[in-house]
């Protein structure tokens, strides 16, 4: 694992997976927002690093720039990139990497590197917006620290603005190592946005503490930050130890749909396993999807009632680990084949097992 003192370091497999998720999501996020009614969108990388790894692989800032640059559609909206890096040597190297990309970037791209902490740099951006009575443009904030130097209050403030989203790396292994250290109490209070994390110190057994701290952060996103949709994704290593969680927060169902698409498309990483960890009673491995679990969830939610295809789709996207692409062929069609559901108002000529019409009502028996 990289040291906080290194200027560049080796790209590890679990980081490669994270970068692939970021690239896939930005490929969807940029056109959705920039082709809409917004004149500007903002991408923030709060712990940007040097922009390159020791093997020459691109870092997250370069991945973001290329994902936005390589869109197939023409984008006229201003796309601002704010890359924050506290280490001066890394920030300087990042500037060099961006300069190498600059000739290929469109004129509507605005790129800025700030050599400061995430708290100071982006806190200043938020404060400036507030002082001027301005709104933060639609923002995707990628917050990927080495440890826990991320004030929860800032995450919550970002989410008060319309069309803003966060992807936060929750470095569980490092957090767990220092959770009982007396010198870190105030830092953990800031990170969790409360003092409740202290209850996890006395928990016996690593799995209990893991779940407690995960659930506390998720609860804070839901209740303190008032984020409508929150999902967490877990990366485990070959020793079955949680390396990190990714917490994704959005108030937009379409954003959640696209993030889940990105997560599910990540290839198996050999010694690492990637899963949706939102529901403690149902961890869903992306490499081994169990559609019987989705069928059970749909049945539990709608059994004995009627629902439209659109109702079911919103439930699958918003409240399960599964994708929009999963529920028709893998759940509704086999349920209709065995008589567990039946269409209430099928249009003339409808083929059994087809659900293109979202207003189609289905009766669950």
Model-derived features with residue positions:
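Class I S-adenosyl-L-methionine-dependent methyltransferase catalytic core
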Residues: 1-365
